[in-house]
Amino acid sequence: MLLSNVAVNRTVVHTQLVSGSRSALHALSRTSHSVPVTHTHQRRHIFSHKRRLSSSTLAIPFALSNTNSATTAPLQFLSNVSLCRVTPGTITTSAKATAPNLDKMSAEAATTAAQASASPVEDSFLKKAVSCQSETEREAVMAARAAKKALRETKETWWAPYVALTKPRLTVLVVLSAMSSYALTPEAVSLTNLLFLTVGTALCSGSANAINMGREPAYDSMMTRTRGRPVVRGAVTPNQAFTFAGITGTVGTAALYFGVNPTVAILGASNIALYGGLYTTLKRKHIINTWVGAVVGAIPPLMGWAASGGSLLHPGAWCLAGLLYAWQFPHFNALSYSIRDEYKKAGYVMTAWKNPGLNARVGLRYALLMFPLCVGLSYYNVTDWWFVLDSSVLNAWMAWWAFKFWQQENVNIALAAAGKQYSQNPFARKLFWGSVVHLPGVLLLAMIHKKGQWDWLFGPSEDEKKKTLSS
């Protein structure tokens, strides 16, 4: 069905909508004039999640209603809302035709609503998408983007905010580090143990993250990176977040206790307390919070090692934990540097803005620590010696970016002391993405080079032969 000369009737601006997730409807046009569209386009349903804005395509939603329903609440027309697919050439022609009717739209209101409803990535994309448009076109695009976001959120399933409470990407990383450690132990692997370890670790991680979000909505709302979190936007209340955390934490700890062993359950429960309690509290008090957070990241490898029946006194277990602990600093210090002004505004005490020189120096120090830790894994027979060679490539890559980050930060500090202007450290972003690639790569190499992994193909090593003969 083709659309031609589509008219937009006045939509009522709502200050609060069901579940608090439709706030972006504020950005819809407040004018009662009609907006003619001079081109015909294929009708698209507004709730299509597959349709994305791109640099070559702009989507404009129009609320279709008859002339007798101008005063009806906008939610009544959700079933009639459509998307028109417009090319850059078309939007220019259309905007010129509609300029007289759009002059009453508040660009400031549209921008505010769009930013409030969009995620950090979407905020950045929106700015790029409209950077080359005229003021009138920017108003139309930003209003359209905000409305599209709000209407998509009305289709959000009831459980989606609770999944978001667990910080899925962070939880996946935590689970993978525990599973990697489990796979690297010299003990026999049990699929049942691995299943309970995976589920229990994921639930404990989700519980800790939910507590963290439930405690910080007022501060998270001040940061672009966190303003889209479910508690901030009202999808769930803090009490609901705490209830969810209690349930997942209890079930997760029980799964670890009965499905794995009590040692792993204690480690899982301690991680909830450290992250949801101590770390979250220290974030607004002292820079030592980063070191506490690194301890939280080092516990999952110990959980994986203990889950297989391995002794926590084994040096190899602590080398694995050390890898995760050391990795936190180049990773997080680079991340926090890029958004240090927002951390400061929100009241989070981070090294990135309290002491930028220390921030870069600590990142470099722990990046270099990766080399001896990887040697330790081979020395204590967790991996073969080829791992030292392979892992050195990734370690050197991350250490290089950490060095450049530290070097440039020293230059910036000197320029600031001399009263001269300096630019953002460009190596922070490179170090951050380098660390994202580094950790999975090192863990994968460790599993490939696990001691005795290839004995079936190449035969046992001389050390293994001596052990066999001596026994």
Curated annotation (Swiss-Prot):
It is a multi-pass membrane protein. NCBIfam families: cyoE_ctaB (TIGR01473). PROSITE patterns: UBIA. The chain crosses the membrane at residues 188-208, 247-267, 287-307, 312-332, 368-388, 430-450. Converts protoheme IX and farnesyl diphosphate to heme O. Keywords: Heme biosynthesis, Membrane, Mitochondrion, Transferase, Transit peptide, Transmembrane, Transmembrane helix. It catalyses: heme b + (2E,6E)-farnesyl diphosphate + H2O = Fe(II)-heme o + diphosphate. It comes from the Eukaryota. One of its GO terms (molecular function) is protoheme IX farnesyltransferase activity. One of its GO terms (cellular component) is mitochondrial membrane. It is found in: Mitochondrion membrane. It comes from Yarrowia lipolytica (strain CLIB 122 / E 150) (Yeast). One of its GO terms (biological process) is heme A biosynthetic process. The keyword Membrane applies. This is Protoheme IX farnesyltransferase, mitochondrial. Its EC number is 2.5.1.141. Belongs to the UbiA prenyltransferase family. The keyword Membrane applies. Residues 1-60 form a transit peptide.
